[in-house]
Structures are given as structure tokens and as C-alpha cells.
């Protein structure tokens, strides 16, 4: 029996990155031997065991053979005669097909070290094409390591295109697509994930609402980048700089979906695209089974982001109504989230990356003023039932009006 550290732990250590999880491959053993040594079996489809002390995963070396459609259609073979090289060959990328023995020596049968040095994401073998989930995984790795200047090898991107055009991605379940997407949204450069999917044609299959934005022009005066698809990825990049929250990043990604519905004869203007985009956000989220909290914020951002841009022109009643509409009284975090997504929208444009966004500050200030109006004062004043809500709203509007007179500049 020989045990090797494999995959991500080896890769990230060589890149000088923190190692989170360590996975091990056991060569020359059987399930019974592992159980006799005190390991606990956890894998149903193939033999994976938990170490009795560290609880890290130890998998018997195995091979995989395509036996059905999609990413689950594989037959696994695990036996003592499966070599380390056999096991590493089934992995997706060469940089993930590295192993390290007890002496610290790196075993590299597929030139993963060379690809690490050259910052290349390259598939190990043609078997890559048998698993459609790998298209999303490579896009996610491209996003994860973009700050280290990694790029996808030409032949790997070509294979991803072939897989997409062959309809392989249609076998992916919504849950797996969302899981990979959510993971990509946590990276430093989530926009790269969607750019890669666009480059290989997968965006049209998995995110048609986003793909439809590419080639749709916006007024050059406000959008020097012109293309709405490019603007969308720029805003996502900016959102990633402003907030680590997946819901903020996803909402920013979806903020302009309504522009994909504008008839070409009306281009480059997109009047009413915000409210129009809400149903597309709902459609996308329903298809991918996006969590409700993330979906709800994305719908609100689509509907109201342009309203925030015009904040100096809003009257106090409209401002308080906005807080009602986003349910800020029960979910106050939405004010900050709306401020961040609107800022990402404004700064996610060519030449506008460093502009100030005072509307975000004014939104936050107006919220502090409105929510500081004490409910108990209204009750103690003798108001009852529905009158409490009406009087509370009136006082909030008055407080915001007073603040706006002093702090918020008047529009021209």
C-alpha cells in the first residue's frame, strides 16, 4: 500500500497559496484493508474513506469509464492493480494531476509542473470531453487563478466548444450549474467565469439571458464600452472589488437583463429596462434554483438601480416608498446592498472606474434618518391600528425632507 497527497493541495502549495483541504490516493489496497486499518468508508459510488484521526479523505486509486450521458454516467474501477498514473489520468487538468509522496517528491506524469510554470489550464486527456461539468470547472479555475495570469490552453478551449456544440451541457442539473456558479462568484475575478462561458458558447446554453446582452449597444456618452455584455462583466468585476457577498455580485450580474428585451429599432436607448428585467431575473433564478434570498435581491436591484442614480431628484415620499419596496424595515442590509450594486453599475464603465458615487452615501444617510424615527412615539401619541403605519410614514417623510434640505444637493 502506498499513499500520495494529490490534486488541489499539491497544486496550491506549489503556487504558494493556502492549502484548505488535503485529499489522498491509496495505491495497492482494498476496501477491506482500509476498514481493517480503522478507516471509515463514506463513498457509495467509489471507495472513499475517512482517516480515523484527521478525518481527511483517502480514496482508492481508480479509473473511470464512460457508461452513460452527463457527468454522472461513469463506471468506476478500483482495485490494487490501478496505478497512480492511471488514477491521475482521469483528472480534469494537468495542474490537478499532480501527486506528492511521503518524501515530498512530486509525481508529474502529465506535465502539470510545466503548465503551472506557464500558467496554463490544460486538459489531461481526451476523456475530459466525457464530463460536461468540466466546462464549468475550467471556467471557475480560470476565474480563481486569473490574478496569477492563468489562461486556458487553446486546445482545451476548443474541446470545451466542441462539448458545448454537441449538447453535452444539457445533461447538467440546475443544482450543479448553480453550485459551480456560486463558487465562481466567490473568486477574486468572477467576471472571468462568465467570459470563458461566453468564449466557448456555454453562456448561450446555461445563461441565455446574460448571453443576449452581448452585441446590444448602449449610448456611447454614458457607456464608452458600448456593448451591454461587456458592461455587465465590468460591473461584476467592480462588484467583486466592493463586496465579498455572493448576493451582491449576482444581483450586479443581473442588473441590466432587461436591455436584452429592447427592440433593435430602439437601440441604443433602453427606457424601462429595469422593471422589464425583473421577469428575466425570476426566469433565470427559477431555472437554476437560485436561493430565494439571492433571487429577491437580484430582482430588486434590476428594478431600482436606475432610481438610485437619480437620487438628488427623488422627493422624500419616493425615498421612503423605496425603503418600503425593498422591505428595508425588516431587511436593513438591503440598503447597503442596493448602494453597492448601484455603485458597481456606475463604475463598471470604461473611464468611470474611479469616479465617486455620492448617491450611495445619500441613500445610506436617508435610510439612517428614516429608520431613526421612533415607532413608540407614534404609539404614545395615541395613534391606533392602521393609523400607526400612516403616521409613522408621514414622520419618516418629514424627517427625510428635513435631511434632504440640509444635506442632499438639489437637482438642476
Curated annotation (Swiss-Prot):
Occurrences of domain HD (ranges): 228-329
EC number from the UniProt entry: 2.7.7.72, 3.1.3.-, 3.1.4.-
Entry keyword RNA-binding: yes
Protein's UniProt keywords contain Transferase: yes
Organism this protein belongs to: Escherichia fergusonii (strain ATCC 35469 / DSM 13698 / CCUG 18766 / IAM 14443 / JCM 21226 / LMG 7866 / NBRC 102419 / NCTC 12128 / CDC 0568-73)
Binding residues annotated for ATP, in chain numbering: 8, 11, 91, 137, 140
Subunit structure: Monomer. Can also form homodimers and oligomers.
Primary role: Catalyzes the addition and repair of the essential 3'-terminal CCA sequence in tRNAs without using a nucleic acid template. Adds these three nucleotides in the order of C, C, and A to the tRNA nucleotide-73, using CTP and ATP as substrates and producing inorganic pyrophosphate. tRNA 3'-terminal CCA addition is required both for tRNA processing and repair. Also involved in tRNA surveillance by mediating tandem CCA addition to generate a CCACCA at the 3' terminus of unstable tRNAs. While stable tRNAs receive only 3'-terminal CCA, unstable tRNAs are marked with CCACCA and rapidly degraded.
Record text on cofactor binding: Magnesium is required for nucleotidyltransferase activity.
Record lineage: Bacteria, Pseudomonadati, Pseudomonadota, Gammaproteobacteria, Enterobacterales
Cofactor(s) the protein requires to work: Mg(2+); Ni(2+)
Amino-acid positions noted as binding Mg(2+) in the UniProt annotation, renumbered to this chain: 21, 23
Keywords assigned: ATP-binding, Hydrolase, Magnesium, Metal-binding, Multifunctional enzyme, Nickel, Nucleotide-binding, Nucleotidyltransferase, RNA repair, RNA-binding, Transferase, tRNA processing
PANTHER family found in the cross-reference section: MULTIFUNCTIONAL CCA PROTEIN
Gene (UniProt): cca
GO BP: any one term: RNA repair
Chemical reaction(s) catalysed: a tRNA precursor + 2 CTP + ATP = a tRNA with a 3' CCA end + 3 diphosphate; a tRNA with a 3' CCA end + 2 CTP + ATP = a tRNA with a 3' CCACCA end + 3 diphosphate
Binding residues annotated for CTP, in chain numbering: 8, 11, 91, 137, 140
Misc remark: A single active site specifically recognizes both ATP and CTP and is responsible for their addition.
Protein name: Multifunctional CCA protein
Amino acid at each position: 500500500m502506498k499513499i500520495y497527497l494529490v490534486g488541489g493541495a499539491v497544486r496550491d502549495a506549489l503556487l504558494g497559496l493556502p492549502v484548505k483541504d488535503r485529499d489522498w490516493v491509496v495505491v495497492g489496497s482494498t476496501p477491506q484493508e482500509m476498514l481493517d486499518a480503522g478507516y471509515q468508508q463514506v463513498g457509495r459510488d467509489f471507495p472513499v474513506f475517512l482517516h480515523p484521526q484527521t478525518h481527511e479523505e483517502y480514496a482508492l486509486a481508480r479509473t473511470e469509464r464512460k457508461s452513460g450521458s452527463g457527468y454522472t454516467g461513469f463506471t468506476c474501477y478500483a482495485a490494487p492493480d490501478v496505478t497512480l498514473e492511471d488514477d491521475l489520468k482521469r483528472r480534469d487538468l494537468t495542474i490537478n494531476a499532480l501527486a506528492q509522496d511521503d518524501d515530498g517528491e512530486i509525481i508529474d506524469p502529465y506535465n502539470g509542473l510545466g503548465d503551472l510554470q506557464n500558467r496554463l489550464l490544460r486538459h489531461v486527456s481526451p476523456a475530459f470531453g466525457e464530463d460536461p461539468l468540466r466546462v464549468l470547472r475550467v471556467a471557475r479555475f480560470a476565474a480563481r487563478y486569473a490574478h496569477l495570469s492563468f489562461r486556458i490552453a487553446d486546445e482545451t478551449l476548443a474541446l470545451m466548444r466542441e462539448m458545448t456544440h454537441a449538447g453535452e451541457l444539457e445533461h447538467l442539473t440546475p443544482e450543479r450549474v448553480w453550485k459551480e456558479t456560486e463558487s465562481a462568484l466567490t473568486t477574486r475575478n468572477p467576471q472571468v467565469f462568465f467570459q470563458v462561458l461566453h468564449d466557448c458558447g456555454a453562456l448561450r446554453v446555461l445563461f441565455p439571458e446574460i448571453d443576449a446582452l452581448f452585441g446590444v449597444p448602449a449610448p456611447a456618452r454614458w457607456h464608452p464600452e458600448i456593448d451591454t455584455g461587456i458592461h455587465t462583466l465590468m460591473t461584476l468585476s467592480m462588484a467583486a472589488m466592493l463586496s465579498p457577498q455572493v448576493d451582491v455580485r449576482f444581483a450586479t450580474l443581473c442588473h441590466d437583463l432587461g436591455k436584452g428585451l429592447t427592440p433593435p429599432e430602439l437601440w441604443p436607448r433602453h427606457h424601462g429596462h429595469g422593471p422589464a428585467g425583473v421577469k428575466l431575473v425570476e426566469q433565470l433564478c427559477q431555472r437554476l434554483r437560485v436561493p430565494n434570498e439571492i433571487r429577491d435581491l437580484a430582482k430588486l436591484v434590476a428594478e431600482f438601480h436606475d432610481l438610485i442614480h437619480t437620487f438628488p431628484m427623488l422627493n422624500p415620499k419616493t425615498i421612503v416608498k423605496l425603503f418600503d419596496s425593498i422591505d428595508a424595515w425588516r431587511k436593513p442590509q438591503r440598503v447597503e446592498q442596493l448602494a453597492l450594486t448601484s455603485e458597481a453599475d456606475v463604475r463598471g464603465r470604461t473611464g468611470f472606474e474611479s469616479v465617486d458615487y455620492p448617491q450611495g452615501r445619500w441613500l445610506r444617510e436617508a435610510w439612517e434618518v428614516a429608520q431613526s424615527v421612533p415607532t413608540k412615539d407614534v404609539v404614545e401619541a395615541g395613534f391606533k391600528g392602521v393609523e400607526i403605519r400612516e403616521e409613522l410614514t408621514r414622520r419618516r417623510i418629514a424627517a427625510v425632507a428635513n435631511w434632504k434640505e440640509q444635506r442632499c444637493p438639489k437637482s438642476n
